[in-house]
A protein has these predicted regions:
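Amphipathic, hydrophobic N-terminal targeting peptides for secretion and organelle import
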Residues: 1-43, 191
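Short low-complexity stretches enriched in small and charged residues
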Residues: 16-21, 42-43, 96-103, 118-124, ...
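Short beta-strand edge/turn micro-motifs at domain boundaries
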Residues: 28-37, 157-191
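Core segments of small alpha/beta cavity-forming domains
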Residues: 40-118
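Extracytosolic low-complexity repeat regions of secreted or lipid-anchored proteins
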Residues: 44, 142-154, 159-165
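Noncatalytic linker/hinge segments flanking ATPase motor cores
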Residues: 83, 88-90, 102-106, 129, ...
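Surface-exposed, charged secondary-structure patches
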Residues: 105-153
């Protein structure tokens, strides 16, 4: 009697293992792996609930968007969503200067000019955490972050440097207040 019970339990265990293996292998065959483009990854990022914590991270995300503008393929709808995502990183003061329509039109015009001149932004980098400068100006907390961009024009490369000014808002989020071109030092750059 004992042998029969052990044999039945062994058969049940083997059947369960085989059934589990079959289920797992069939599940993988049936599920299609969806590969998102960089534009789709940025556009589906929930910035409202997963906002970057540091000024450097804000600029890194903004740079991902810049790389999408100048380097990736996208539809006009995806570009509109991308510019909306970028505006979520901007301070209210900068948003007033860049309405939704104006910012989208400016990006379209700049991208068209780059294409006409056979220019692309081939790489971007942000200064390391130690190079971020924090300043208190009256009630405002400001941060200055350096970034650089490799620009490819035909077969030639050049490097452009920008300084981003970010301000901490009432929710504790760092928002881009301004950015402008500066003379730079490549030794401060880090991906």
């Amino acid at each position: 009697m004992k042998k029969i019970v052990v044999t039945i339990l062994a058969v049940i265990c083997i059947a369960a293992v085989c059934g589990g293996f079959y289920y797992v292998t069939q599940k993988d065959k049936n599920s299609e792996e969806v590969i998102l483009t960089e534009v789709q990854k940025v556009n589906t990022k929930n910035i409202d609930t997963d906002y970057p914590e540091t000024p450097r991270e804000v600029v890194k995300l903004f740079n991902r968007m810049i790389m999408c503008y100048y380097k990736e393929e996208y539809t006009q709808s995806e570009l509109a969503t991308l510019t909306e995502q970028a505006r979520k990183l901007m301070d209210d003061e900068l948003l007033k200067q860049n309405t939704k329509e104006n910012y989208l039109a400016a990006v379209k015009a700049d991208v068209a000019e780059y294409k006409e001149l056979n220019k692309t932004v081939s790489q971007s980098s942000v200064g390391d955490s130690n190079s971020v400068q924090y300043i208190k100006d009256k009630e405002d907390e400001l941060a200055y972050v350096n970034a650089s961009y490799f620009i490819k024009t035909g077969n030639e490369f050049s490097r452009t440097y920008e300084k981003f000014v970010l301000r901490k808002n009432d929710e504790g989020q760092w928002k881009i207040l301004d950015f402008y071109q500066v003379e730079g030092d490549s030794s401060e750059d880090e991906e």
